[in-house]
Every structure is written in C-alpha cells, then in structure tokens.
C-alpha cells in the first residue's frame, strides 16, 4: 500500500473517483472539483493532501471525540488485538470486555 506522500492529490482524487461512492454527495460538484483527500490527523486537526490544516468539528462523525493520535488509546487497542481482537457471542459464548 503506497504511503500518502507517494501520490499527488490528483492521483488520490482519481482513485477515489474510480472506486468510491460518497454518501450525501452532490456528484456533479464532486466530479468538477474532486474530493478533499485527508492524509493524517493530530489532536483536533485534520491535514489534507495539499497541506491544509482543518479543524475537525464533527470529530470524524462523532467517532473520535477524544481527538486523533492518542498514544495511550492506540497502545490499549494494540494490547487488546494481541489478546482477543474479536469473537462472536453466538452459540452461548462470552468474553470479557
């Protein structure tokens, strides 16, 4: 998988145009200007492929209200992934949270 810096904004927009259907989108406008390509995030800010810093007021659709780049959360998720990333609760099974 290429690193974001390995492609131009136009190249990422072209891939996006070919392979993704954006929800709640004016497709005529999207075709005219292309998608904003978000390449990284830190704290409450997003950064696009053109280097613009953008305040993420919607917290990634309210999924990252604690901010981006929180090392302690990434470490906790890593430890959990090593122990038990997922198991279903069908067939009378349970697991600790």
Question: Which positions does each model-derived feature cover?
Answer:
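Short hydrophobic/aromatic-rich motifs at helix boundaries and adjacent loops
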Residues: 14-16, 45-49, 70-76
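Intrinsically disordered, low-complexity segments enriched in small/polar residues
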Residues: 18, 22-25, 45, 66, ...
